[in-house]
Amino acid sequence: MHAEHSVAQDAFTEKHNSGYSLSPQIYYANMYFAMAEICDTLQKDLKKSIEFKQKGTTILNNVKSQYWNAEKGCFASGPRGSEAYEKGIWEATGAEACVWPKFHVSDHQQRQIFLQTIKTQKNALNDFGLNWYPFEEGKNHFWNTCWVSWTEGIAVAANHEGDMELLRKLIFQQVRNVVVNKTFHEAVDYSTGRAWRWPGLTWHASAFLGYFMFGLLGMSYEKEGLLISPCIPQEFSHMKLCNLRYRDAVFEIEICGSGNQFDIYVDDSKTEFIDVAIKGRHRVMLCPKH
């Protein structure tokens, strides 16, 4: 699918991607899957559903075969034959979409390798955030800038791979931003940590909570209910999350230790899964396995 720039920005043509930037491919593939799901749920246009699934699968297979550069340890922001692929150039939104398990792009090994690349790539990750464009030397509100919402999926990937060091770093980047600025800015300067653009943004406040819900607690919403797969660094070993609404239920979630192997208790009953039909107020305890 022709796309001259990543979803990270809407101002510049990214010539090194040869007209086929990575992140839009992933979003469009999942758009087709979502449209198919709507058709199936409503039991309407079922022929269209098949067509949508085929299109989504084709795009996703192309991403897997054309953008993964094993030598550079990344999903490049352009396909095979592009400058981005040859040099192993990547950007944050493509990286996030590739490693976020819900988008079904990377396998376990690729996810681990790419997370390691993100951690070790020069000019990619510091105490202030993830640089949207680690390979660009200029500075504007896209280049050498961190945008708060766009690393949540990397936090989820860190949870899946049990990478507490990375998960901890990603969360504390956001804690720092909030404590220092006392509001939710969108753009943070990668070099200085100065939050300089668009304060008070509700979707970045939501993303801040998402680091805890989906990164730390490993929550995922399924048709049948709610899954919780915690990965808890020591600093969060006694955290409470109160008044969390899930459909017709309200949860008080309490963490009782650290690690990535937990038993889940709802009102003192051990469970692997919280059913979608649950109602009322409930206490959810996350207890390390012994």
Regions found by a protein language model. Name each.
Residues 16, 20-23, 44, 48-51, ...:
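Conserved aromatic-histidine-acidic binding/catalytic patches
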Residues 156-290:
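Non-catalytic C-terminal accessory modules of carbohydrate-active enzymes
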Residues 49, 56, 110-111, 166-167:
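Solenoid-repeat scaffolds in large eukaryotic assemblies
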Residues 33-38, 56, 62, 87-97, ...:
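C-terminal extensions
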Residues 19-30, 88-93, 145-153, 162, ...:
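Aromatic- and histidine-enriched alpha-helix N-cap/loop-to-helix transition segments
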Residues 26-45, 95-108, 152-164, 211-220:
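Well-ordered alpha-helical scaffold segments within catalytic/enzyme domains
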Residues 22-67:
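Active-site neighborhood of glycoside hydrolase catalytic domains
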Residues 1-20, 61-148, 169-192, 217, ...:
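Extended glycan-interaction surfaces of carbohydrate-active proteins
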